[in-house]
Amino acid sequence: MGNNKKDSNSNYPFASPEGEAGVQLVPKLDTPKMYKVILLNDDYTPMDFVVLVLRRFFAKTEEQATEIMLDVHKKGAGVAGVFSLEIAEMKVMQVNQFAQLNQYPLKSTLEEEA
């Protein structure tokens, strides 16, 4: 089978394939799942507040924020951004707390990106 000796030229205690001194095998890492943060429409939150949320928490330009806000208004929901799970969860929490603090019913949620 393989040569299980340490490569004398390496500081790493990894076994090398037969006869290939210095070759280190790197495990393939899976790409992390990404999650969409979605803003949900309601009948009370003003459009300018939704734009403010998109600019403040998602670093959107005025034009980008307005486009997403119109999706929320017309389609019932709009994607604010796509993030790793931890970042998406934090964004959802920030948006929901900010809306509640300002006494608006705006809600956000996350959904795994397909």
Swiss-Prot record:
This is ATP-dependent Clp protease adapter protein ClpS. It comes from the Bacteria. Binds to the N-terminal domain of the chaperone ClpA. Involved in the modulation of the specificity of the ClpAP-mediated ATP-dependent protein degradation. Disulfide bonds: none annotated. GO terms for biological process: protein catabolic process; proteolysis. The lineage of its organism: Bacteria, Pseudomonadati, Bdellovibrionota, Bdellovibrionia, Bdellovibrionales. Pfam families: ClpS. Belongs to the ClpS family. InterPro entries: ClpS, ClpS_core, Ribosomal_bL12_C/ClpS-like.
